[in-house]
Amino acid sequence: MRVVMCILIISFTVIFGMSCERHMEQQVSYTEADSLNHLAYDMRYKDLSVAMKAAKRACQLAEGNSDLRAEALNNMGFCAFMRMDFEKASSLYLQALKEGGNEIEHLISDVGMMKICQRTSMNKEFYDYRNSALQRLKRIREDEALISDTHEKQRLNYAVSEFHIVSGIYFYYLEQHDESLRSINSITPDVLQGDTAQWLYYEYMRGSGGMYEAPTREEITIGE
């Protein structure tokens, strides 16, 4: 009986140790995936190849973590969009929408699909994804006070700024100038604080897209 008990104890100890080791390895992978997601985002306007490579690796390492995978897929979708591979970008954003229940990442996916629909003249689908994004944003705002993670806040600010920029551009090309200005002016400076690349993108689109407002024509020209 004692021999059996000893065998059981040893077996349990070995199994428990292996389980702990696997858990630790998984956590190391998730930490690396998180760092790679940050790198992919930071490099998105500097080097698309580096950004895509980092996002792909993050997606692999994030197996079992839907939040990290959704973020990686969104980063990959952005890179594909920038390369004008709209079919690939669409596939990645739609895949991200199926990952878990992270409303912030799903909001980013919706906005990514809005950009694709705008570029491919899919007007009905644009409004479908825009309405979905508005509903998500409403739900997020209801619980926004509970968001304490700095990275989550940054992702939300990115999503919100992208939503208003994309909407502003869309309405501008439809010659709905009041709606376009209303959308672009919804972006407040604090939303882009700490995200230089996104702030520059916002300023560029605002100026080049004719979404700058000022009292006189001369001031508008200077501002743009």
Question: What does each of the following model-derived ranges do?
Answer:
Residues 56-60, 94-98, 131-149, 181-192, ...:
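Amphipathic alpha-helical segments of tetratricopeptide repeats
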Residues 27, 34-35, 71, 108-110, ...:
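Residue register of alpha-helical TPR repeats
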Residues 45-46, 76, 83, 120, ...:
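Structural motif corresponding to the intra-repeat A-B loop/turn of tetratricopeptide repeats
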Residues 6-15:
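Bacterial N-terminal signal peptides
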